[in-house]
């Protein structure tokens, strides 16, 4: 086991604070509409340019082990806020730095760290309550656009694109962000249910120019197992031919004789038909087939339920106004399912989302909800260079997370005003002793840190701005750093999601409280470097005359 180095008391805390400051100082330059960029060197490829706090925090690794521990703890604040709210990472980092700095001063003055932490926890809970009660719901898409714009560092175009995407797929819809090959940033919406399985044979194509198979007012057969022979379903196929409607077969696979027979019938013009593989694998495949059945008002033909293909009648099939299939995807639009049943299925999947602990499962379940409830939107981010596209994609991701958070828990005044107003609920609040009172005072002072930083990044004195806002009785009064004027922040369109502000404060106070109560730090001792090798011994050069 390698030797360890141990630091105690103020020596440990000073080294830790130094690490906290290095990381927080690098992150906080990005805060606000006039925040600056940070350039990050990459071991391969071009450097990365970003204004995303968590991206900066994740890149910082210090050579001094004790300083690095402090930095990593604050990095944890940014990561947790990012995971929970998707935005507000820089605000959380600035708050954590302010709480740690003030807290360590109080510890150095002889106060009890545990009582300070209790005071910090009491004050944080009180302010979080105030933020929740001050939140108001998002009323229209212009407010969604404003939230997105603020989070994208003032780029209104990004805010508008996100508002458009949310309007088209609904608040429950899935919105994904991808890099675009071109210059433009655009929104593409896939309505209906789409899954990533294409036609099993190009002979099913009905539109040769676009290489897609389109079926209008189609029947849909959902089969859980492989189809290798069509013999059992001849009566069903005859019923479909009589109805003169096209048929889509979704099965685990359609192979051999069955596929050949379908293709021959299609080419002879007797049967408008297409076949695709069922989406997903294992249990997820069963669940997705059931989703399609509910959406189209059909039944999944499953041997588990004792259903056989020879007994299937035409009324067991699903129906859809339109089915479009290309070589990679199948889209079912306007299924004939009952609205009440679809809503029941959606709430059932939502229940599973709440209960699951796996991020991957949660993401897949959310996709299923979106496909049943609204649709899927893709924001394709463009730019002049690859570096610009990546930087912009970071901001679109942040803005998208912020707007989702706003829809969930409502909005509050932006620009750090919600935190300064929240501090007013701490007036008159006292703890069990004077050290707890000091902890409450630490939070009251720290809550002004984000507003001060936003102002300072805009080249204005932060103390003056914080003082003016603190003295105002108008809860929406604040400083718009973009235009450098004071006034009603709601009218300026400077708003923040309540969830982001709340999460930033909770995570910052949680980690900062742990740092303040640190009394000893242990790290591996660096290995002593081996001395540089000298010239090898030549063994004497005797005998020379």
UniProtKB/Swiss-Prot annotation:
Which compartments is it annotated to reside in? Answer: Cytoplasm
Report the EC number(s), separated by commas if there are several. 5.6.1.7
UniProt keywords (A-Z) are:
ATP-binding, Chaperone, Cytoplasm, Isomerase, Nucleotide-binding
Q: Which InterPro entries match?
A: Chaperonin_Cpn60_CS, Cpn60/GroEL, Cpn60/GroEL/TCP-1, GroEL-like_apical_dom_sf, GROEL-like_equatorial_sf, TCP-1-like_intermed_sf
Q: What class of enzyme is it?
A: isomerase
The chemistry this enzyme catalyses reads: ATP + H2O + a folded polypeptide = ADP + phosphate + an unfolded polypeptide
* Domain of life the protein comes from: Bacteria
Looking at the Swiss-Prot or TrEMBL record, what is one Pfam family this protein matches?
Answer: Cpn60_TCP1
Molecular functions per Gene Ontology: ATP binding; ATP-dependent protein folding chaperone; isomerase activity; unfolded protein binding
Region annotation Disordered: residue ranges? 526-545
Quote the record's binding site residues for ATP.
Answer: 30-33, 51, 87-91, 415, 496
**Primary localisation category:** cytoplasm
* Residue ranges with Gly residues bias: 536-545
**GO BP of this protein:** protein refolding
Q: Name one GO cellular component term.
A: cytoplasm
The family assignment reads: Belongs to the chaperonin (HSP60) family.
Assembly and oligomerization: Forms a cylinder of 14 subunits composed of two heptameric rings stacked back-to-back. Interacts with the co-chaperonin GroES.
| Role description | Together with its co-chaperonin GroES, plays an essential role in assisting protein folding. The GroEL-GroES system forms a nano-cage that allows encapsulation of the non-native substrate proteins and provides a physical environment optimized to promote and accelerate protein folding.
NCBIfam families, per this entry?
GroEL, PRK00013.1, PRK12849.1, PRK12850.1, PRK12851.1
* Name this polypeptide is given: Chaperonin GroEL
Q: Which organism is it from?
A: Paracoccus denitrificans
